[in-house]
């Protein structure tokens, strides 16, 4: 992660060299004031998001710790549902076979 080099205080205390044809000092100051305000908002937002991230990570950890009790109960399907699925697959295959005979049987006759 990149490190933040500037703080609102550093921006405020930054001194610029002056030259004969330099920038307008008030314009630079106004711009830096805007930068300071934005930077302050960004710092608060990052802090808020880090706190939210920590809370969510704690939630995930606690949820995954309690998960094994539920996982063992739901991981094994009952044999009754397995029999129903195989019976319905058999019925579907019979139906498809009958439909294919009907469709392709007519094409061969024509």
Swiss-Prot record:
Assembly? Forms polymers through the coiled coil domains. Interacts with PBP1, MreC and EzrA.
* First-listed, main subcellular location of the protein, grouped into a coarse class: cytoplasm
Q: What would be the name of the gene that encodes this protein?
A: gpsB
Q: Where is the signal peptide?
A: none
The free-text function statement in the UniProt record for this protein reads: Divisome component that associates with the complex late in its assembly, after the Z-ring is formed, and is dependent on DivIC and PBP2B for its recruitment to the divisome. Together with EzrA, is a key component of the system that regulates PBP1 localization during cell cycle progression. Its main role could be the removal of PBP1 from the cell pole after pole maturation is completed. Also contributes to the recruitment of PBP1 to the division complex. Not essential for septum formation.
Cellular component GO terms, alphabetical = cytoplasm
Say yes or no: keyword Transport present.
Answer: no
Q: Which InterPro entries does the record associate with it?
A: Cell_cycle_GpsB, DivIVA_domain, DivIVA_fam
BP terms from Gene Ontology: cell division; regulation of cell shape
What is the annotated localization of this protein? Cytoplasm
Which keywords does this Swiss-Prot/TrEMBL entry list? Cell cycle, Cell division, Cell shape, Coiled coil, Cytoplasm
Q: What is this protein called?
A: Cell cycle protein GpsB
Family, according to the entry, reads as follows: Belongs to the GpsB family.
PANTHER family xrefs? CELL CYCLE PROTEIN GPSB, CELL DIVISION PROTEIN DIVIVA
Give me the disulphide-bonded residues.
none
Coiled coil residues, start to end? 37-67
């Amino acid at each position: 992660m990149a490190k933040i080099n500037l703080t609102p205080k550093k921006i405020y205390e930054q001194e610029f060299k002056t030259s004969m044809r330099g920038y307008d000092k008030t314009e630079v100051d106004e711009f830096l004031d805007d930068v300071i305000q934005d930077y302050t908002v960004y710092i608060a937002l990052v802090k808020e998001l880090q706190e939210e991230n920590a809370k969510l990570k704690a939630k995930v950890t606690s949820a995954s710790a309690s998960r094994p009790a539920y996982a063992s109960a739901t991981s094994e399907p009952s044999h009754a549902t397995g029999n129903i699925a195989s019976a319905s697959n058999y019925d579907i295959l019979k139906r498809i076979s009958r439909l294919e005979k009907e469709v392709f049987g007519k094409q061969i006759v024509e």
